[in-house]
Each structure stands twice: as C-alpha cells, then as structure tokens.
Amino acid sequence: MGRKKNRGAKFAEGDRVFYFAPRACEENGGHPPEGTVLRATRKSGYWQYQVQVAGTDRITTWDEMLMGAVDV
C-alpha cells in the first residue's frame, strides 16, 4: 500500500496506530485497539481517520487527538 500523507495530517495511509479513547479501550478489554489508517479527512479544523481495526473486518473513524503511532 502506498504511504500517502495529506498535508498537515499526523498519520499517513498504511500507518499502524492505537486509539486511546476511554470507551474504545473499555470495549477492547482495557487495552487500546490497534488499526491501519485507510484514509485521512479534515473536518471542522481537525483530522479524522478511517481505520481498519486489527483482527476484524470493521472500519471505523478515529479522531487524531486520541491516536498514537505504533513504533516498529
């Protein structure tokens, strides 16, 4: 997958990320869910990312303020 990064976005397409929202962690057994960025969009002055959650076929939208990169 190409590593397309939108200007000003924190994460690029294909980046592996964690989501630190309290509810998401609670739903994932107390651990932050991991996913892969599919697309970034700017909405109301901040970035949102469509992410495919690891280990599932679920695609969801995460806010940049609650995301962190996976160091590899």
Language model region names:
Residues G2-K4, A12-V70:
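Basic/aromatic-rich interaction segments and small domains that mediate binding to polyanionic partners
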